[in-house]
């Protein structure tokens, strides 16, 4: 029997868990969290220990590595903690995972904020930090990482994913390799995951 899961992560009280508007047959809903008081009627709350002094990385290891934490499932859909399911997720699986083991949404299709470049994404992060006095990550770390990619010849305007929703056959070998590489970049460099994955995908083509 094929097992399917929608999952999310909430660490450090960053998001308020949103109940799904639609609960399809054959799907489980799991939330990984460090919050012992988090409750839900629809989500299975999985309280887990933290591994880092960084709530973002604590959350992203579950986001990026479902093969480690959800190996009993064949298909997974990750959604950000502030998002909800409104329609049948089987349609997403049928539309996007028939010929691929992983699928993301294209940031350049975002009508309000289209972007297609990791270097532009880094600039937006810098501008946001300057404007608000609160950087989403160490700007010097991001600058160093982007310089490394430039030195390796990674081109501008080569695409950008949005990481709010990820569809995966996460136990497939190529998906596991990609996710482990993605996690290595996040673990040792910037935690801004959108800066990394499209570059890794480019290297595998």
Model regions: which residues?
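Residues that flank catalytic or metal-binding motifs in active/ligand-binding sites
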Residues: 2, 25, 63, 79, ...
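The conserved acidic donor/metal-binding loop of glycosyltransferases
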Residues: 80-84
């Amino acid at each position: 029997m094929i097992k399917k899961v929608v999952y999310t992560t909430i660490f450090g009280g960053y998001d308020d868990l949103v109940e799904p508007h639609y609960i399809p047959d054959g799907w489980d809903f799991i939330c990984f969290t460090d919050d012992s008081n988090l409750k839900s009627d629809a989500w299975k709350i999985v309280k887990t220990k933290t591994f880092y002094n960084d709530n973002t990385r604590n959350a992203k290891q579950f986001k990026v590595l479902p093969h480690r934490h959800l190996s009993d499932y064949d298909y997974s859909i990750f959604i950000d903690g502030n998002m909800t399911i409104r329609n049948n997720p089987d349609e997403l699986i049928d539309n996007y995972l028939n010929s691929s083991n992983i699928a993301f949404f294209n940031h350049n299709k975002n009508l309000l904020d289209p972007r297609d470049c990791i270097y532009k994404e880094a600039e937006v992060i810098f501008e946001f930090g300057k404007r608000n006095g609160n950087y989403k990550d160490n700007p010097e770390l991001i600058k160093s990482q982007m310089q490394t990619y430039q030195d390796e010849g990674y081109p501008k305007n080569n695409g950008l994913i949005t990481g709010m929703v990820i569809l995966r056959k996460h136990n497939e070998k190529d998906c596991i390799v990609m996710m482990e590489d993605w996690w290595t970049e996040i673990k040792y460099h910037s935690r801004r995951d959108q800066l990394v994955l499209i570059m890794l995908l480019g290297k595998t083509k």
